[in-house]
């Protein structure tokens, strides 16, 4: 209710009561004013009531919510179901226009405002997480998950380069959507095998440079590197890769899917942008901001390239993933976001200690990757630990499966999600996009041992870690 209407209410009830009400509504208006002026995360997150008030106020700016509006066009933001309308807070027009995903819509000032504010909040959150300003000239939040966003990024890079640049040099990462994003963009993936460094699987920089010389600079569009990954693979050497790309004038796209929560990765991205060439780095919204799957953020030091990606997106887009991030960041606030990052870092140390203790008690080994991989762990698997486990042996015989693969299914049946078993005894081969991979899932052809991977990702709790260790212990020691 605006001030004029509140003053009118003084003719209906006591003026002193209305003065109190004016004070209360002024507090809300001040919060909204601060958000609109500063466009940053509030220091303390807003409660759900305040966020809903903000959403309802802004949605009234869209034409489909005008009281006297009539629509005679083909796309008028009509919503049949009341549940659907409630779910979207009345936002029906999506984001962007046919020529640009970030262009403002005449019919949807509210939706356009939400998009603009969300981009500003995301930039603020990324800086708070540890990215330097020089690496963040702009960002683009798209309603597509990471794989499709990577494909659009490479398509855009391809559109501004000569057509003969067909090859993408890709240090092997056994995640299907990464490879498929290259193929979807109509490009040819050139797999760069990794190399072993102790327990770690690492980037082979010499192999990258040799392949550049072999194929020719004029034929290579970019190097497609990866930061966040499952141990024992560790993040690619993106600083050195960026320097190679700068030296040869080759594009560099970084898949930073869930790396936004890791300060070491963000420091390396900032350094790569400063010392070499980085065209864009892409991160997932669900893995970093704890929202439903469906969004990804494109960032980079070159604002013009990010704008070009925006212009290349065909048509309008769904605004739900943008709205999810907007609500979540307002709910977290600056302190909530920083606390989540801090807690994850502390629990990483605790998880490492508990896994090390477990490994010692069960004659296994926690692979030594923590100095480079600050999110994921890998624990060796030895058949000796399961020779007397009647449940696993029985299931293994009945299903004709390998013992190690049964461990993963048994963990899942005990409500432990997210762990992965890499069984190297099976010599698993997989064909993707015409390329055959040996021991798929391990990121390398010849790793020495089977293992179990887990992750210490943002939002994990100490209780989850303790419960996982307990359930894993029962599986190892069940007679």
From Swiss-Prot:
Where is it located?
Cytoplasm
- Which Pfam families has this protein been placed in? SepSecS (PF05889)
> Catalysed reaction per UniProt?
O-phospho-L-seryl-tRNA(Sec) + selenophosphate + H2O = L-selenocysteinyl-tRNA(Sec) + 2 phosphate
Q: Which cofactor does it need?
A: pyridoxal 5'-phosphate
Part of which pathway?
A: Aminoacyl-tRNA biosynthesis; selenocysteinyl-tRNA(Sec) biosynthesis; selenocysteinyl-tRNA(Sec) from L-seryl-tRNA(Sec) (archaeal/eukaryal route): step 2/2
A cellular component term, taken from the record's GO annotations: cytoplasm
Which residues are substrate-binding? 97-98, 105, 316
Give residues annotated as binding pyridoxal 5'-phosphate: 75
Q: By its UniProt entry, which InterPro entries does this protein fall under?
A: PyrdxlP-dep_Trfase, PyrdxlP-dep_Trfase_major, Sec-tRNA_Se_transferase, SepSecS/SepCysS
The answer to whether UniProt assigns keyword Protein biosynthesis to this entry is: yes
Q: How does it assemble?
A: Homotetramer formed by a catalytic dimer and a non-catalytic dimer serving as a binding platform that orients tRNASec for catalysis. Each tetramer binds the CCA ends of two tRNAs which point to the active sites of the catalytic dimer.
Write the protein's name.
O-phosphoseryl-tRNA(Sec) selenium transferase
Organism of origin is Dictyostelium discoideum
């Amino acid at each position: 209710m605006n001030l004029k209407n509140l003053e009118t209410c003084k003719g209906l009830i006591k003026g002193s009561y209305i003065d109190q009400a004016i004070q209360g509504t002024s507090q809300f208006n001040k919060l909204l004013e601060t958000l609109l002026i500063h466009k940053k995360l509030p220091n303390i997150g807003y409660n759900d009531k305040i966020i809903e008030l903000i959403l309802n106020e802004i949605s009234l700016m869209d034409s489909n919510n005008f009281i006297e509006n009539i629509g005679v066009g083909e796309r008028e933001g009509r919503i049949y179901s009341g549940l659907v309308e409630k779910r979207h807070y009345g936002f029906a027009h999506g984001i962007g226009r046919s020529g640009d995903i970030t262009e403002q819509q005449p019919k949807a000032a509210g939706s356009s405002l939400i998009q603009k504010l969300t981009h500003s909040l995301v930039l603020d959150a990324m800086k708070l997480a540890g990215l330097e300003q020089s690496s963040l000239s702009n960002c683009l939040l798209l309603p597509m998950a990471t794989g499709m966003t990577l494909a659009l990024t490479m398509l855009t890079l391809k559109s501004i380069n000569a057509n003969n640049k067909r090859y993408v040099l890709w240090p092997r990462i056994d995640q299907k959507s990464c490879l498929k994003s290259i193929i979807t963009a109509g490009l040819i993936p050139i797999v760069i095998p990794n190399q072993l460094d102790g327990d770690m699987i690492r980037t082979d920089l010499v192999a990258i440079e040799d392949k550049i010389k072999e194929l020719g600079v004029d034929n290579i569009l970019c190097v497609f590197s990866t930061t966040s990954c499952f141990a024992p693979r560790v993040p690619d050497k993106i600083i050195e890769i960026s320097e190679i790309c700068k030296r040869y004038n080759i594009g560099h796209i970084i898949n930073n899917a869930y790396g936004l929560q890791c300060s070491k990765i963000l420091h390396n991205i900032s350094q790569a942008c400063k010392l070499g060439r980085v065209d864009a780095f892409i991160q997932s919204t669900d893995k970093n901001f704890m929202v439903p799957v469906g969004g990804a953020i494109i960032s980079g030091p070159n604002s013009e390239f990010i704008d070009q990606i925006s212009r290349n997106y065909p048509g309008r887009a769904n605004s739900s993933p943008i709205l999810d991030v907007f609500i979540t960041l307002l709910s977290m606030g600056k302190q909530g976001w920083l606390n989540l990052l801090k807690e994850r870092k502390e629990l990483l140390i605790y998880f490492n200690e508990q896994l090390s203790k477990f490994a010692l008690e069960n004659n296994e080994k926690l692979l030594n990757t923590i100095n480079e991989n600050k999110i994921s762990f890998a624990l060796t698997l030895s058949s000796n630990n399961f020779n007397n486990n009647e449940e696993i042996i029985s299931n293994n015989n009945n299903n004709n499966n390998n013992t190690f693969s049964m461990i993963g299914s048994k963990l899942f049946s005990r409500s432990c999600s997210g762990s992965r078993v890499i069984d190297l005894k099976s010599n698993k081969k997989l064909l993707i996009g015409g390329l055959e991979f040996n021991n798929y899932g391990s990121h390398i052809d010849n790793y020495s041992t089977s293992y179990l991977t887990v992750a210490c990702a943002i939002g994990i709790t100490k209780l989850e870690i303790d419960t996982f260790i307990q359930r894993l212990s029962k599986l190892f020691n069940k007679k």
